[in-house]
C-alpha cells in the first residue's frame, strides 16, 4: 500500500512588508498590530516598491524599522505637509502619513486640516490613544473628560482644557476627503474591520482618488497606568462612547 502523501497549506505567514525586527513598543500597545495590518494591506495590493511611509515625532517615529518600504521622518506635526510634497513630486507613489493624536491634532492641526481640505491624494493613519505616550503620559487633544494624565492629575477639565477633539467628525465637514473611517484594535472583530479600512485607504491611492483618513483607537497601557487586558476593555467602555466607530464617508 503506497504511503500517504502529506501536503502542507500555509494559513498564516509574516507579511513580506513587515520587518522581523523586534519592536520597541510597550506590552499591550496597539502600534505593533497596526503595523502588521498596514504591511498586510501593502502586500495584498502589491505596492511594496511604490509605498513611502512618513513618520513624525511620537511613539511611531521609528516605524520605518518595522515596515520594509521607503520612509521619511517629519518634524513634529508636519507629516501631512511632507507627505503632500512627496506625493506631488511622485504622483505614482503610495504615500502614507502615520501619526499619533498629539502630533496630528495639536502641533499638526493646521497641516491636518489643510491637507484634507485640499484633497491631497495621500492616506493618513491616525492612532488615537488619548494620551501623549512617548513623552510620559501627558494630556492630548483626544484625552477624555475627567481622564487623569501627568498634566491633568485631577482629570481633564473642559473649562480649562476644552473637550476631546473628534478628528473624523471634524474632517467630515470638509468637501474634499473621499474616505473617513474610525476603527479600533482592541478585539479580533475590531482588528478585522481596521484591516479592511486600511486596505481601502491604500486602494484609493492606487485608483488615484483623493484624501483618505483612517482613525484607529489604540491601547496605551503604560500611559494609562493599567494592565494590557484592562486597556483593551477600556477602549470599548470609555473611548468608543466618545469616539463612535464607523464609516463617515466612502465615495
Protein language model features and the residues they cover:
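Conserved thiamine diphosphate
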Residues: 92, 140-207
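Glycine-rich beta-alpha junction loops
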Residues: 57-59, 129-131, 184-187, 216-223
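Thiamine diphosphate
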Residues: 1-133, 196-200
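Short, hinge-like loop/turn segments at secondary-structure boundaries
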Residues: 69-72, 115, 140-144, 230-233
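Flexible, low-complexity linker and terminal segments
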Residues: 1-11, 15, 20-21, 206-251
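Active-site-proximal loop->helix
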Residues: 109-114, 134-148
Amino acid at each position: 500500500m503506497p504511503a500517504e502523501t502529506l501536503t502542507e497549506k500555509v494559513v498564516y505567514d509574516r507579511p513580506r512588508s513587515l520587518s522581523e525586527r523586534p519592536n520597541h513598543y510597550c506590552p499591550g500597545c496597539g502600534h505593533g498590530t497596526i503595523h502588521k495590518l498596514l504591511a498586510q494591506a501593502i502586500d495584498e495590493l502589491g505596492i511594496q516598491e511604490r509605498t513611502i511611509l512618513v513618520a513624525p515625532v511620537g511613539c511611531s517615529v521609528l516605524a520605518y524599522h518595522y515596515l520594509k518600504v521607503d520612509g521619511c521622518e517629519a518634524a513634529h506635526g508636519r507629516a501631512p505637509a511632507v507627505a503632500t510634497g512627496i506625493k506631488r513630486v511622485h504622483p505614482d507613489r503610495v504615500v502614507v502619513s502615520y501619526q499619533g493624536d498629539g502630533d496630528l491634532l495639536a502641533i499638526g492641526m493646521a497641516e491636518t486640516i489643510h491637507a484634507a481640505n485640499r484633497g491631497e491624494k495621500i492616506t493618513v493613519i491616525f492612532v488615537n490613544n488619548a494620551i501623549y505616550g512617548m513623552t510620559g503620559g501627558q494630556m492630548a487633544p483626544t484625552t477624555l473628560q475627567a481622564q487623569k494624565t501627568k498634566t491633568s492629575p485631577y482629570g481633564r477639565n473642559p473649562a480649562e482644557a476644552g473637550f476631546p477633539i473628534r478628528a473624523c467628525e471634524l474632517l467630515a465637514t470638509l468637501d474634499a476627503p473621499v474616505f473617513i473611517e474610525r476603527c479600533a484594535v482592541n478585539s479580533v472583530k475590531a482588528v478585522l474591520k481596521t484591516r479592511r479600512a486600511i486596505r481601502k485607504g491604500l486602494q484609493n491611492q492606487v485608483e488615484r482618488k483623493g484624501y483618505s483618513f483612517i482613525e484607529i483607537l489604540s491601547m496605551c497601557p503604560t500611559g494609562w497606568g493599567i494592565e494590557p487586558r484592562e486597556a483593551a476593555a477600556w477602549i470599548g467602555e470609555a473611548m468608543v462612547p466618545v469616539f463612535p466607530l464607523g464609516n463617515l464617508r466612502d465615495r
